[in-house]
């Protein structure tokens, strides 16, 4: 401690991970502090509330061993900051930005506040460039657009971790492969999940263009609140200082929100819906709204937050509030997963509100929008007929109805259930045509005659042309 550094010794009480310090109203909200006990051991902490009477500090480690009479607090930094550098690409960090890959600390080019800076709405450019994830259901029916924030709604026990890893290794902006990067932040991981992501990124070579932030379930709750902000600060730096197109994958936001609730409970705040704090909407918006494209800047930040819906309830506050802020959703389906379909993405409740901006002639392919609409209509019809067959049997169906039933089966098996293949958008559209061509031309009411003349009749053996397995 320097001679000019002030210490705060009047610790009023300790509640769980929180310290309440009297006469510390001059500490700033968000400041990083150092907490010492009688033995001289130091712990980090962050100021999460300041009033005229006291300051509330969230301790980054356990509070065991801290004594009210001997504990002291001193200021380290006015706000939580992260040292950022282009050399972070290819590295693994914990939730606080400390290296966990056995390599030295990154030499920082800048130290930036993890809260970021508000993006001027007038400076935002319209997102209109297609990002290819290599997953047919996403690319064709719920297209991800550069600068968009498109969440994935999953559930407990569903393979959203595998889906996240697949998107991370396959995603690219066609024509910009050299300046595309992935920032991956995972919160509340078990040790098995940490091993899975570490091995998967290394095995597939995805780590070479990625920055990983891995927060474990046994880490302090406050670290889960800092992890996505560390990731987004890194993404903004790579995008707007070095011109990268950055895809940020955040998983699992449910763990983040539960940490928010845990800290709110320790602070004895009045709870909102289902015990979550009333400011959760604002807090989530402070994360999601950091995605975008800025006029005059070469890079961009695109977000794919992943959250597991408790009890598969899409009206739960976490997915509900997320839906208000973001631009659509991709829904992982338990029924498809039980059939062994991977990735089990159900296109019917899924939606990309910006899809129309980034697909079509000159962007993907002229027939893209028509194919997407026709797949939605035909699959919905096939599912309705499945329900009818469960009641009346197939004898009551027409020949066309039976073709729709077969279409629904083929759609799930070949289009949705692609496994670990990395498909280009042309591959995915070829698969779609191969399945749609089993329906009579008269049923393809959402596709132009020119497209039907050009593509109708695609054979099943052509469906896999250009596809490759990464298994």
From Swiss-Prot:
PROSITE patterns: ATPASE_ALPHA_BETA. GO terms for biological process: proton motive force-driven plasma membrane ATP synthesis. Keywords: ATP synthesis, Hydrogen ion transport, Ion transport, Transport. GO terms for molecular function: ATP binding; proton-transporting ATP synthase activity, rotational mechanism. It comes from the Bacteria. Coiled coil: none annotated. PANTHER family: V-TYPE PROTON ATPASE SUBUNIT B. Belongs to the ATPase alpha/beta chains family. HAMAP family: ATP_synth_B_arch (MF_00310). Produces ATP from ADP in the presence of a proton gradient across the membrane. The V-type beta chain is a regulatory subunit. This is V-type ATP synthase beta chain. It comes from Deinococcus deserti (strain DSM 17065 / CIP 109153 / LMG 22923 / VCD115).
